[in-house]
Regions:
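Helix-turn-helix
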Residues: 10, 18-52, 56
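Short alpha-helical scaffolding segments that buttress acidic/His motifs in well-ordered protein cores
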Residues: 91, 95, 108-115, 160, ...
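An amphipathic alpha-helix adjacent to DNA-recognition modules
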Residues: 8-13, 47-70, 74-77, 81, ...
């Protein structure tokens, strides 16, 4: 990694930690430059503005996450033998992998901040850049659940997404036991969540 790319990555990592801790409004550029060990000119050079920096923090994680989701969905989409659990696995497993991958857990706190702070510009950014992912999953859910109205399906998908976000946060009642590996615990979480979500989506 060259010096410029290394500086940009360092700024993104510091910003992610600060946004998780202080929120988007609470984290100042002065705090960011101190945490990243750079000057303000470097932040402006790589990102131009704080808003652009916030967006790049999201893109760094979500571009990869959603590429994995869509690749998994492509493997099962439209096939007559595809089950609801197959589509849910494509949606859930990459997200759980992210939450346990390096700084992914920290990013989940940033994502939670985004929803909690009701930032309209950030919501628009997420919708504009990643809304197509949810639309593709929703279309496949609708194919498998033709008995549901569009409104009812949206309600259920929204609640499934909430359950996934909770599972990714790591703050649930079920914590990993000391004799269970991280990989095994993640697989247990995925299996339980997929079964739970499938039951909720397909309920009468």
């Amino acid at each position: 990694m060259n010096s410029s790319a290394s500086t940009k990555e360092r700024i993104l990592t510091a910003a992610e930690a600060l946004f998780a801790q202080r929120g988007f409004e609470g984290a100042s550029l002065r705090q960011l430059t101190a945490a990243a060990g750079v000057n303000l000119a470097a932040v402006n050079y790589h990102f131009g503005s704080k808003d652009n920096l916030v967006e790049e923090v999201f893109k760094r994680r979500l571009d990869q996450l959603n590429a994995r989701r869509l690749a998994a969905l492509k493997q099962v989409s439209g096939q007559p033998e595809t089950t609801l659990e197959d589509v849910l696995a494509a949606f859930i497993r990459p997200a759980l992998d992210l939450s346990h991958d390096g700084g992914g857990g920290l990013f989940m706190r940033v994502l939670a901040r985004a929803f909690a702070e009701h930032d309209d510009s950030l919501r628009k950014f997420l919708s504009d850049n990643y809304g197509h992912v949810m639309r593709q999953f929703t279309a496949e859910f609708a194919r498998l659940l033709p008995q549901l109205t569009k409104e009812e399906l949206y309600w259920r998908i929204d609640l499934v997404t909430g359950a996934l976000t909770h599972a990714m946060s790591g703050f649930g009642m079920i914590q990993r036991k000391s004799d269970v590996s991280e990989v095994t615990h993640r697989e247990q979480t995925a299996a339980h969540l997929i079964r739970f979500a499938a039951a909720g989506l397909s309920a009468p």
